[in-house]
Amino acid sequence: MNFPIERVRADFPLLSRQVNGQPLVYLDSAASAQKPQAVIDKELHFYRDGYAAVHRGIHSLSAEATQQMEAVRTQVADFIHAASAEEIIFVRGTTEAINLVANSYGRHFLAAGDSIIITEMEHHANIVPWQMLAQDLGVEIRVWPLTATGELKITALAALIDDTTRLLAVTQVSNVLGTVNPIKDIVAQAKAAGLVVLVDGAQAVMHQPVDVQALGCDFYVFSGHKLYGPSGIGILYGKSALLQQMPPWEGGGAMIKTVSLTQGTTFADAPWRFEAGSPNTAGIMGLGAAIDYVTELGLLPIQQYEQSLMHYALAQLSQIKSLTLYGPTERAGVIAFNLGQHHAYDVGSFLDQYGIAIRTGHHCAMPLMAFYQVPSMCRASLALYNTREDVDRLVAGLQRIEKLLG
């Protein structure tokens, strides 16, 4: 496979550092990905040479910054194949995007006696906002269970839907198991029953091309920092017809048309009515640079390279006798495992001494831990800059821990 891995690795300056006297092996990109120099440079350039407050400024710097920000909105729309840039809302991240939908769409369109569906594999960010909404409104939450292999059974969805069901919130790729859900089929079944569908794409957009119109979902959410972009910036996509019906969630500057102490406030059109206050303009610029970066490499070549690396990693890890792997064979991005009866924290601490960075704990997915009846797991995640040598270092580290701890 002719993927330019050496050039790619050279683009990420942090990968050259050492940790505990060892060359860094960074296997925690599912938590937050490293940043290419192009993203770092873009933010630096904006702060150094072009910074100004956006919106309504008549001076050149403000006009330029506003134009650049809106250009990124169009770029994001093109990246996920939205019908219009006006379907793209800038938020702080996936968590805020889901909370926005729950508090704007949910509180406006749902009522006591309605039901919504989530799955057993969701990140807490796609559970807790719906629980809070359900508690306040008297809405029922129904849970779509998993199979033994950590997958959703498409035919099980129909039994969860009745005439009270209004919304389905589902992840495209599990942040723990790497399960790639057949979102297009799921959305089609849900839409046939009249449901609104929110898709959590936080673990998908960096691993595969996304076309929200082809998927047919009503809302799609993701974060910049997992897409090799800055922290503190994310995206909510919403179908225009829905966004125009939704009230603002937060109030403040930039999201209004008029404000009167006697006549009240009228709000801007979507998407701007959902962007109260000063935006993370530098983060938006960096997100644009990150999208440029992965687009130049090509998401299909990235997907093919990562899938080849994933197959290699699973084959090598399966040779460790005391290691338990969780999730399906075909997956994207992440590998969850435990080593014998050793606590994930201990395994992660030992690996850190060898310069290997993984994530340990419940991964903001406590219901999934309960499903597997474990308190925690180790998670190694693969990105476009990882190599077989990284996998070999991980395997060697685990084998060393196995010998040390028994």
UniProtKB/Swiss-Prot annotation:
<dbReference type="InterPro" id="IPR015424">
    <property type="entry name" value="PyrdxlP-dep_Trfase"/>
</dbReference>
<dbReference type="GO" id="GO:0031071">
    <property type="term" value="F:cysteine desulfurase activity"/>
</dbReference>
<dbReference type="InterPro" id="IPR015422">
    <property type="entry name" value="PyrdxlP-dep_Trfase_small"/>
</dbReference>
<feature type="active site" description="Cysteine persulfide intermediate">
    <location>
        <position position="364"/>
    </location>
</feature>
<dbReference type="GO" id="GO:0005737">
    <property type="term" value="C:cytoplasm"/>
</dbReference>
<keyword id="KW-0963">Cytoplasm</keyword>
<keyword id="KW-0808">Transferase</keyword>
<dbReference type="InterPro" id="IPR010970">
    <property type="entry name" value="Cys_dSase_SufS"/>
</dbReference>
<dbReference type="GO" id="GO:0006534">
    <property type="term" value="P:cysteine metabolic process"/>
</dbReference>
<keyword id="KW-0663">Pyridoxal phosphate</keyword>
<dbReference type="Pfam" id="PF00266">
    <property type="entry name" value="Aminotran_5"/>
</dbReference>
<dbReference type="GO" id="GO:0030170">
    <property type="term" value="F:pyridoxal phosphate binding"/>
</dbReference>
<dbReference type="GO" id="GO:0009000">
    <property type="term" value="F:selenocysteine lyase activity"/>
</dbReference>
<dbReference type="InterPro" id="IPR000192">
    <property type="entry name" value="Aminotrans_V_dom"/>
</dbReference>
<comment type="subunit">
    <text>Homodimer. Interacts with SufE and the SufBCD complex composed of SufB, SufC and SufD. The interaction with SufE is required to mediate the direct transfer of the sulfur atom from the S-sulfanylcysteine.</text>
</comment>
<comment type="similarity">
    <text>Belongs to the class-V pyridoxal-phosphate-dependent aminotransferase family. Csd subfamily.</text>
</comment>
<comment type="pathway">
    <text>Cofactor biosynthesis; iron-sulfur cluster biosynthesis.</text>
</comment>
<keyword id="KW-0456">Lyase</keyword>
<comment type="function">
    <text>Cysteine desulfurases mobilize the sulfur from L-cysteine to yield L-alanine, an essential step in sulfur metabolism for biosynthesis of a variety of sulfur-containing biomolecules. Component of the suf operon, which is activated and required under specific conditions such as oxidative stress and iron limitation. Acts as a potent selenocysteine lyase in vitro, that mobilizes selenium from L-selenocysteine. Selenocysteine lyase activity is however unsure in vivo.</text>
</comment>
<feature type="modified residue" description="N6-(pyridoxal phosphate)lysine">
    <location>
        <position position="226"/>
    </location>
</feature>
<dbReference type="InterPro" id="IPR015421">
    <property type="entry name" value="PyrdxlP-dep_Trfase_major"/>
</dbReference>
<protein>
    <recommendedName>
        <fullName>Cysteine desulfurase</fullName>
        <ecNumber>2.8.1.7</ecNumber>
        <ecNumber>4.4.1.16</ecNumber>
    </recommendedName>
</protein>
<dbReference type="InterPro" id="IPR020578">
    <property type="entry name" value="Aminotrans_V_PyrdxlP_BS"/>
</dbReference>
